[in-house]
């Protein structure tokens, strides 16, 4: 009959099996499961692209205590730029380098667009859709250089054609016969005088206007001369008065 074993002692190994003695007096510590929040052992290098490193990264869209409540997920650099502008760390303007790439798109290359305390970024919750409608966010200072629209809209002055004496004489001869020259005749005259059809057309148009003015002036002069012939002259009136006076004296 086997003797009773003491309490707490390990059970006897079966016959025929080899028993490995422990390497040390301490029992091996149980392995702890690796999780996303498990601290890494010092001295061990892990790749930042490993599964554990990716899972251990904090959510970039998690609400921070320094950002306004109810705001959308906005890059932290945007709030940093707005806070620096509001607290006086920078002047009224913040350069576009303080903003992330997706917010700085669309700025014109002028120094200092106004980004500082607009739409209550530090006091009220602003969503991503409201940022596009904020007045002053995309505004520019009054002294910013702007393109002069009047110069672009101003029509260029038409270059006046200089005709030589031979061309003017030929044009006057044709105008004396026909005041309006169109079609094939105008093309032939332009080719003969080494001019374009547009130049000939403009000359005839201006010549007709001049001719109408001359006709009106001649009509006015003719009417004035006719009126002067109908009225008695001052010398005839004086002679009539003197004759009346002499006849009165004789009577």
Swiss-Prot record:
Keywords: Developmental protein, DNA-binding, Homeobox, Nucleus, Transcription, Transcription regulation
CDD domains cross-referenced by the UniProt entry: homeodomain
Biased composition (Low complexity): 15-35, 224-242
Organism: Homo sapiens (Human)
Gene3D superfamilies (UniProt xref): Homeodomain-like (1.10.10.60)
Gene Ontology CC terms, in alphabetical order: chromatin; nucleus
Location of region: Disordered: 1-47, 224-251
Molecular function as annotated in GO: DNA-binding transcription factor activity, RNA polymerase II-specific; RNA polymerase II cis-regulatory region sequence-specific DNA binding; sequence-specific double-stranded DNA binding
Known function: Transcription regulator acting downstream of both FOXA2 and Brachyury (T) during notochord development. Required for node morphogenesis. Is essential for cilia formation in the posterior notochord (PNC) and for left-right patterning; acts upstream of FOXJ1 and RFX3 in this process and is required for the expression of various components important for axonemal assembly and function. Plays a role in regulating axial versus paraxial cell fate. Activates the transcription of ciliary proteins C11orf97 homolog, FAM183B and SPACA9 in the embryonic ventral node.
Underlying gene: NOTO
UniProt protein name: Homeobox protein notochord
GO BP annotation list: brain development; central nervous system development; dorsal/ventral pattern formation; embryonic pattern specification; heart looping; motile cilium assembly; neuron differentiation; notochord development
Biased composition (Pro residues): 1-14
DNA-binding region ranges: 156-215
Subcellular location: Nucleus
Phylogenetic classification of the source organism: Eukaryota, Metazoa, Chordata, Craniata, Vertebrata
């Amino acid at each position: 009959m086997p003797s009773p074993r003491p309490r707490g002692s390990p059970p006897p190994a079966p016959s025929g099996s080899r028993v490995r003695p422990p390497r040390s007096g301490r029992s091996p510590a149980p392995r702890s499961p690796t999780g996303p929040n498990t601290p890494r052992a010092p001295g061990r290098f892990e790749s930042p692209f490993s599964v554990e490193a990716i899972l251990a990264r904090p959510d970039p869209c998690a609400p921070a205590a320094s950002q306004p409540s109810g705001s959308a997920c906005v890059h932290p650099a945007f709030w940093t730029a707005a806070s620096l502008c509001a607290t006086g760390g920078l002047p009224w303007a913040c350069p576009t380098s303080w903003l992330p790439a997706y917010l700085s798109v669309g700025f014109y290359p002028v120094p200092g667009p106004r980004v500082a305390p607009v739409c209550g970024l530090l006091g009220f919750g602003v969503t991503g859709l409201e940022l596009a409608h904020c007045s002053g966010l995309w505004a520019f200072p009054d002294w910013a250089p702007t393109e002069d629209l009047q110069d672009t809209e101003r029509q260029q002055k038409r270059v006046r054609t200089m005709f030589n004496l031979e061309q003017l004489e030929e044009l006057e001869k044709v105008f004396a016969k026909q005041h309006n020259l169109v079609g094939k005749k105008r093309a032939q005259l332009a080719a003969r005088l080494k001019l374009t059809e547009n130049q000939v057309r403009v000359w005839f148009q201006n010549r007709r206007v001049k001719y109408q003015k001359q006709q009106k002036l001649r009509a006015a002069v003719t009417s004035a001369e006719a009126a002067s012939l109908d009225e008695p002259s001052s010398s005839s009136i004086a002679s009539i008065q003197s004759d009346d006076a002499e006849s009165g004296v004789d009577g």
